[in-house]
């Protein structure tokens, strides 16, 4: 598997009058005593520092292999470069970068910023979307019981008893009155419907609103009550 790595070259020229950099050849002791682990860490994780300054003063020519990679650090005393590649590969994995030149004098300085390409890699990412399901709050109607039973046996039932209690809270009319209306109109059947179009516990007409749920039916009955009072149910 091929791997692309960064190699950077930085050239520095000083324009201060009377100042020059003298060449220096590295001795064996200068290259063998270098901290190779530190150089590996810089090349792999901190290339900016290698671009900013040479690894040591003077000229040097450092080459070594570590953990399957060939590392190269060279300088002629005024220019330096570094690179690393897979050791023993028949392909060159060193990518040259733009040179940075810094000119300095006693009055002004001009800097051309170096553009360094980041390593490229093929990366696969998988994304999962979370799904949240929502359910309408449910009510336990079994806790409500009707206290009204008509002579024909009709009652408001547990759902009707709940609806009657809600209407009593909204209108101030007793819950037993609303249970009586529900027992007479629908026998406590939530989905009761007749040919006139009236539907639900309170047998309200479509103009008063939806009767799809218990709360819808309570809202529709309340609208009818606000408009006509109990006369909406012939009382």
Swiss-Prot record:
The keyword Hydrolase applies. Residues 117-147 have a biased composition (Low complexity). GO terms for cellular component: extracellular region. Residues 95-115 have a biased composition (Polar residues). It is found in: Secreted. InterPro entries: Lysozyme-like_dom_sf. It comes from the Bacteria. Keywords: Glycosidase, Hydrolase, Secreted, Signal. Is able to cleave peptidoglycan. Belongs to the transglycosylase family. IsaA subfamily. This is Probable transglycosylase IsaA. The gene is isaA.
